[in-house]
């Protein structure tokens, strides 16, 4: 397995798909990286030369990936919570942030139901 920016990418998959295993690199970014380096998208990772892997690593190091990107996202969420914005409050309460209805659904974010017992009549 080749190691690019601290992530072991699978050998038997196409390069364009393998690069998406890196956090912060999606399909369009992977395609543009390979296009700038003139590497075919259809080639397998095991068929890459050491020089090609080194070039891909250098090109990907220009992007924010893995730890830097995760840290930036968590700091952005923390900042929203500190300034007390609406989005920050929704993050703090563990509710949907982007305007989704939460009256009936939103179970994924809210977690399992908390049932309340009825009083006997």
UniProtKB/Swiss-Prot annotation:
Start and end residues of each stretch annotated as Disordered: 92-121
One MF term from GO for this chain?
structural constituent of ribosome
Q: Which GO terms describe its biological process?
A: translation
Q: Which GO terms describe its cellular component?
A: cytosol; small ribosomal subunit
- Which SUPFAM superfamilies is this protein grouped with? S13-like H2TH domain
- Function statement: Located at the top of the head of the 30S subunit, it contacts several helices of the 16S rRNA. In the 70S ribosome it contacts the 23S rRNA (bridge B1a) and protein L5 of the 50S subunit (bridge B1b), connecting the 2 subunits; these bridges are implicated in subunit movement. Contacts the tRNAs in the A and P-sites.
Q: How does it assemble?
A: Part of the 30S ribosomal subunit. Forms a loose heterodimer with protein S19. Forms two bridges to the 50S subunit in the 70S ribosome.
Q: Which HAMAP family match?
A: Ribosomal_uS13 (MF_01315)
Q: What is this protein called?
A: Small ribosomal subunit protein uS13
| Organism annotation | Mycoplasma mycoides subsp. mycoides SC (strain CCUG 32753 / NCTC 10114 / PG1)
Gene name, Swiss-Prot/TrEMBL = rpsM
């Amino acid at each position: 397995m080749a190691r690019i920016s601290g992530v072991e990418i699978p050998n038997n998959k196409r390069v364009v798909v393998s690069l998406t295993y890196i956090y912060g690199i999606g399909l369009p970014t992977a395609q543009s990286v390979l296009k700038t380096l003139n590497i075919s998208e259809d080639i397998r990772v095991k068929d890459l030369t050491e020089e090609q892997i080194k070039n891909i690593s250098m090109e990907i190091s220009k992007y924010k990936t893995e730890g830097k990107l995760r840290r930036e996202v968590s700091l952005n969420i923390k900042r929203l919570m500190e300034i007390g914005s609406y989005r920050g409050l929704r993050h703090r309460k563990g509710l949907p942030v982007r305007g989704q209805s939460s009256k009936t659904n939103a179970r994924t974010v809210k977690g399992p139901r908390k049932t309340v017992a009825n009083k006997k009549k």
